[in-house]
Amino acid sequence: MATPHINAQAGDFAETVLMPGDPLRAKFIAENFLEDVKQVCDVRNMFGYTGTYKGKKVSVMGHGMGIPSCCIYVHELIAEYGVKNVIRVGSCGAVHDDVKLMDVVIGMGASTDSKVNRIRFNNHDFAAIADFGLLETAVGQARELNVPVKVGNVFSADLFYSPEADLFDKMEKLGILGVDMEAAGIYGVAADLGAKALTILTVSDHIKRGEKLSSEDRQKSFNDMMTVALETAIKL
């Protein structure tokens, strides 16, 4: 039952799929966090894997960069493979003064300059939000693990190299915590298809302060994010 972009078979994916942007990060997660791992897809080198975490079946698959790419994979996973829960695990650039490098940010909502959700909603504004059950579970698991998290609005940008430098000041004023490129699209697809979605991000750089994580610190904060995501996945 392969799709144009996923060559997995029926039953290959768990009901919950963790999705980083980078397919090599998906491979890393599978090899370092899961047991009994099987690679289930590799079209366009967008790798997907299924294994177990603490005895529960969990899948991980890359979604690429940007809303158009992630929407393809999330749509096909939900519509064709019966996936119920999508948890994006990625990085973001902080814009808010209260957010610092290595913080874990959970996207309660996702603003965007993309038009995809307006197209989806007859040119009306759509409030792209996380599923509350996933959000509540993730926050609870973070507290149990003593992983500090910031919960709030993020901004999903179409342009990585944005010409609108003054927009970051407006984002901070409106309480936006950080910038990614996918959350709003994932929330839109999940809502449209009746699935649940959540975005958990690691702050890899601070856009306004020009700060960036070292490779060592990036890995440490990534591990915290992944543990929160996986502990959330097995509670669903």
UniProtKB/Swiss-Prot annotation:
A purine D-ribonucleoside binds at residues 5, 180-182, 204-205. One of its GO terms (cellular component) is cytosol. It holds the Pfam family PNP_UDP_1. One of its GO terms (molecular function) is purine-nucleoside phosphorylase activity. Its EC number is 2.4.2.1. The active site is at 205 (proton donor). The keyword Transcription regulation does not apply. It comes from the Bacteria. One of its GO terms (biological process) is purine nucleoside catabolic process. Phosphate binds at residues 21, 25, 44, 88-91. CDD domains: PNP_EcPNPI-like. Keywords: Glycosyltransferase, Transferase. The record marks 218 as: Important for catalytic activity. Homohexamer; trimer of homodimers. Belongs to the PNP/UDP phosphorylase family. NCBIfam families: deoD, PRK05819.1, PRK13374.1. This is Purine nucleoside phosphorylase DeoD-type 2. It comes from Aliivibrio fischeri (strain ATCC 700601 / ES114). The gene is deoD2.
